[in-house]
Amino acid sequence: MDNKKRIVVLGGGESGAGAAVLAKVKGFDVFLSDRGKIAAEHAALLKKWEIPFEEGHHTEELILNADEIVKSPGIPTSAPMIQKIMERGIHIISEIEFAGRYDTAKKICITGSNGKTTTTSLIYYLLKEAGLNVGLGGNIGKSYAYQVATEHFDYYVLEISSFQLDNCYEFHPDIAIITNITPDHLDRYGYEMENYVKAKFRITRNLRPEDCFIFDSDDAITINHLNKIVTEAKKLPFTQETKVKQGAYLDNDKIVVKYEDDECDIFLKELSLGGKHNVYNSMAAALAAKATGIDNEIIRNSLETFAPIEHR
């Protein structure tokens, strides 16, 4: 018998298949189980990497002997198999947590109830336009774990849902963004808004003094919870209702972005995305770009030329 750590992946979608490939690349004993049917492309990927898997059922003896479980975000904690795993005391993590262990890239991570996909896409575009070597993942595009296994990027822009954050513990973003928080997915959080808010704020739990936390200071739910927690990160609010010394705000017909000693002004009429909500998204993206060291001219040009594209 070899003593390789056994990783069992539950769920054979984009997230699970990617996590299984990363586990294989890292030399673990890997098994993937999906209670439903696995899509042909993901089954083909698992076969290509010679990863054993099952679909249509869960075989307990092949799962409950795991050293660690990587759970796909769509599986609720209330699922019978998850309950059995928890009773055994087997550690459950998300694909994001797993991939983060092996990724040395700078990570810009975005969560929120609304606007996170647009904001993620904007930031990815900004970094690409700046000529940076950047990957896109999380809840959008290719599996983050699969990219960590098979590619090399200096930066990742990751859209992360509350379900993905639920099983993150040590994962460390360099820039964390919460676009806003409104009641959503409450069935997964015991119909308690506070539980959902705490899930979103998990994105901030490992931030360090040199990191940045970008948030909507016009969002009462976000501010209420922010006042209850301690974070060492640099706080960069964005707002359409007041002016801030550090962060982004509206000044008549333009967005003003202030980061450290620098200021970037962007006229609203130049933004490629219209609507008040997209002003917020553009503010968050511009702040992330400034914190990454991107030139003002590139930020302005990118926000003027961005066109929403389908990444999935």
Question: What function would you assign to each model-found segment?
Answer:
Residues 15, 33, 72, 113, ...:
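Short linear Ser/Thr-Pro motifs
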Residues 18, 122, 143-146, 283-287:
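Short amphipathic alpha-helical face segments that pack within enzyme cores
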Residues 4-6, 24, 61-64, 73-217, ...:
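Phosphate-binding loop of NTP-binding sites
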Residues 1-94, 98, 274, 292-297, ...:
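N-terminal leader/targeting and accessory segments in enzymes
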Residues 13, 36, 140, 218-219, ...:
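Residues in the short beta-alpha loop(s) of Rossmann-like NAD(P)-binding domains
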Residues 4-5, 10-12, 190-197, 232-312:
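Adenine nucleotide phosphate-binding catalytic loops in nucleotide-utilizing enzymes
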Residues 21, 44, 83, 125, ...:
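Surface-exposed charge patches
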Residues 11-16, 56, 74, 112-115, ...:
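Glycine-centered flexibility sites
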